[in-house]
């Protein structure tokens, strides 16, 4: 009996979801150990139909726990899908948190377990992943990047920004920040993820990072010369390859700005400062 890996994936009309599932199964050493926990929110029936077809194809190989819900504006927010996915955890041995657009290297399951087993139960392997090319699904970078604090605001105007940086070191592992698109831990991570259910988008990672550290978790990355897992970033999507819905796909520009930069800012500032300093 192989140790089980609970793979939690939220998805929002994402064409890469089924490819991610298939890739994880085909590249794992023991696909029978994988327990996929999926929360699919869809506005297009094709997303549901594609997932149902893949469930029929792979349900006799890996285990699946699936929630499918028709889109409603109240379901928007990264934490909502993640919470539903992680709520189906049932004491599996390991937990892998990813996004629905992820690439896996061969033997990824054994590699991650061997890495994690060198540390205590409150260690999480995380960090910023390199990108992959969706047309043909191949990696476009190696290793795991350090999340480096930068003064300039490159993606969010109202909170500290952390940009990817290659690590030049001989150490086997290095300390890092929590990344929501890649985190691997033991049962301890399954019991407590640190997720803030109020987070809409930008506030998710810094709050989850803080919560985990407050509970005694250590967050590290492997210093490796190969592609372990990769993530599909927005600027690598082209045409139908890697196509996925965004917040602006469902909301007006004004509504999207409210949820991303007013509501979520209040969540962030209220958490870290006790009140929203932007409204003082």
Language-model-derived ranges and their functions:
Residues 17, 30-31, 38-53:
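A conserved acidic beta->alpha catalytic loop
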Residues 21-25, 53-54, 80-85, 170, ...:
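Eukaryotic intrinsically disordered and solvent-exposed regulatory patches
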Residues 134, 141-149, 153-154, 159-179, ...:
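C-terminal catalytic/acceptor-binding lobe
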Residues 72-74, 79-82, 86-87, 94-98, ...:
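Conserved catalytic core of nucleotide-sugar-dependent glycosyltransferases
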Residues 5-14, 27, 39-41:
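A conserved hydrophobic helix/loop-capping motif in glycosyltransferases and polysaccharide synthases
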Residues 23-33:
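Short, acidic, metal-binding catalytic loop of nucleotide-sugar glycosyltransferases
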Residues 1-6, 61-64:
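A short, charged/proline- and glycine-enriched loop
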Residues 46-93:
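Active-site-proximal specificity loops/subdomain of glycosyltransferases
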